[in-house]
């Protein structure tokens, strides 16, 4: 099989960035390349289309990596997606469709079936692409998880993938992390580690050269390059609550407060707002932070009922009502839209034991959770502008007689609600919404163009600072023969 595993010394070492940049660099060379991550844990997901034409759910990061690879996103690129819920259990998405729920205690029992499905997905993907760039998860040297690993070196063993390890030098201790990562692996797994990539280096790379030479001498493995720290690199986040590509707000900018729900999901919905020069977008978690907000966004959540209870416990419900009474706009997206309605019912226990609660009553709609998840890519118009988005939800909305239709959602005065994620990424739609809600003139900012420019920038950095020719050759030829063993090896 032709492919490469990008592992990391730790979480957030830069695996996603390196994988994404490699996908763009190889695609620009005319290589038919696909991204892959056996298992992702994130509440930031995206809808794509499965082979039967139905909607399917994958991690947002793998969707962006597919864009970087200029490939069509599909479930095989992220066969297992874990979405943390409200009760220390995770909802499992397998090949784009709901599979069940697991807790840490019963995870071991279901892992074998998921591993088989994930590896079959890789094999099928590899049969259709010249190169598959696989991203690992966390670190490959988590000793307590080694036995059931199918995401890192478990995948590399299955597919015979050479592996490069990424380390974040900005944190410090990267040389110890590189050496220790290899030294804690079994001889079989050490043989798969071809070398290293240094990430987020600041300063003169010549000063780093002696350390890199020593690392190569001590490990018998090469360093494939050093990526510099760059302020303009942003990717759709998997877990960290941050605004991708956020720019400094101009003087007099309108303040947008995004309520920081404990189980917030798909918060990438507000990334496009963060690019607008006339907006200052912040996350808010207490009533006082809404006092000076011009627009409040109530985002999606993995646990609508539980997060609504949290919102009330913090007094944010009263703050929202004061905001609306002052004539200022609120936008609810998916779970946030459901909270704005009159009632939320859960007769099938989709979210837990609570059968139903009253909503905030700011929109004349009711929500009932059904047992089947809706996954689709709708399109329509909003304020005369073309609108597209994606839906990931169990809630079915019933509208009252006095509510104007808004996409598939509702509007009452300055309170807006929609079940569509991603709608604000449309430039014309976003401009018209901001004009309607805040009186903000169109800025001319293009979110899709900004994302594409960042993917090109990441590809440029990979081309300039990594040995892409050597990495491509490695992916095509397989693990390097004759690599030395570093004691002590796996315990």
UniProtKB/Swiss-Prot annotation:
Residues 253-429 form the GATase cobBQ-type domain. The active site is at 334 (nucleophile), 421. Pathway: Cofactor biosynthesis; adenosylcobalamin biosynthesis. Coiled coil: none annotated. SUPFAM superfamilies: Class I glutamine amidotransferase-like (SSF52317), P-loop containing nucleoside triphosphate hydrolases (SSF52540). GO terms for molecular function: ABC-type vitamin B12 transporter activity; catalytic activity. One of its GO terms (biological process) is cobalamin biosynthetic process. Belongs to the CobB/CobQ family. CobQ subfamily. Catalyzes amidations at positions B, D, E, and G on adenosylcobyrinic A,C-diamide. NH(2) groups are provided by glutamine, and one molecule of ATP is hydrogenolyzed for each amidation. PANTHER family: COBYRIC ACID SYNTHASE, DETHIOBIOTIN SYNTHETASE. This is Cobyric acid synthase.
């Amino acid at each position: 099989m032709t492919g490469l595993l990008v592992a990391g010394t730790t979480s957030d070492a830069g695996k996603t960035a390196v994988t994404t940049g490699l996908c763009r660099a190889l695609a620009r060379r005319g290589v038919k390349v696909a991204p892959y991550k056996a298992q992702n844990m994130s509440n930031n997901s995206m809808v794509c289309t499965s082979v039967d034409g139905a909607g399917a759910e994958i991690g947002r990061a793998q969707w962006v990596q597919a864009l970087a690879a200029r490939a069509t996103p599909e479930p095989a690129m992220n066969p297992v997606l874990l979405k943390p819920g409200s009760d220390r259990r995770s909802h499992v998405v397998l090949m784009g469709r709901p599979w069940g729920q697991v807790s840490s205690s019963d995870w071991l029992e279901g892992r074998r079936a998921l591993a088989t499905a994930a590896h079959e997905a890789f094999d099928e993907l590899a049969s259709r692409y010249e190169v598959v760039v696989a991203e690992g998860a966390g670190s490959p040297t988590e000793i307590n998880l080694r036995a059931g690993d199918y995401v890192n070196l478990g995948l590399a063993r299955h597919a015979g993938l050479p592996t490069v390890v990424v380390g974040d030098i900005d944190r410090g201790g990267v040389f110890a992390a590189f050496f220790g990562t290899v030294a804690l692996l079994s001889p079989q797994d050490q043989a798969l580690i071809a070398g290293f990539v240094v990430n987020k280096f600041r300063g003169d790379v010549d000063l780093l050269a002696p350390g890199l030479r020593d690392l190569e001498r001590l490990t018998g493995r090469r360093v494939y390059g050093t990526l510099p720290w760059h302020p303009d690199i942003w990717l759709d986040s998997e877990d960290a609550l941050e605004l991708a590509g956020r720019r400094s707000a101009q003087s007099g900018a309108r303040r947008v407060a995004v309520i920081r729900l404990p189980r917030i999901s798909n918060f990438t919905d507000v990334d496009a707002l963060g690019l607008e020069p006339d907006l200052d977008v912040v996350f808010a978690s207490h009533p006082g932070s809404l006092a000076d907000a011009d627009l409040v966004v109530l985002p999606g959540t993995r646990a609508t009922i539980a997060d609504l209870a949290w919102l009330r416990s913090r007094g944010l419900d009263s703050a929202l009502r004061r905001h609306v009474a002052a004539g200022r706009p609120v936008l609810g997206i998916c779970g946030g839209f459901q909270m704005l309605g009159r009632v939320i019912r859960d007769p099938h226990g989709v979210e837990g034991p609570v059968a139903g609660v009253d909503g905030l009553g700011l929109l004349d709609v009711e929500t009932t959770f059904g047992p089947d998840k809706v996954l689709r890519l709708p399109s329509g118009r909003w304020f005369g502008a073309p609108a597209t988005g994606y839906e990931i939800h169990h809630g079915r909305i019933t509208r009252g007689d006095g509510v104007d239709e808004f996409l598939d959602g509702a509007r009452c005065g300055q309170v807006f609600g929609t079940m569509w994620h991603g709608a604000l990424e449309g430039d014309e739609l976003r401009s018209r919404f901001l004009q309607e809600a805040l009186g903000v003139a169109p800025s001319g900012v293009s979110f899709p163009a900004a994302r594409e420019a960042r993917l090109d920038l990441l590809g440029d950095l990979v081309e300039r600072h990594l040995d892409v020719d050597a990495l491509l050759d490695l992916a095509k030829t397989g693990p390097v023969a004759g690599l030395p063993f570093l004691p002590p090896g796996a315990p």
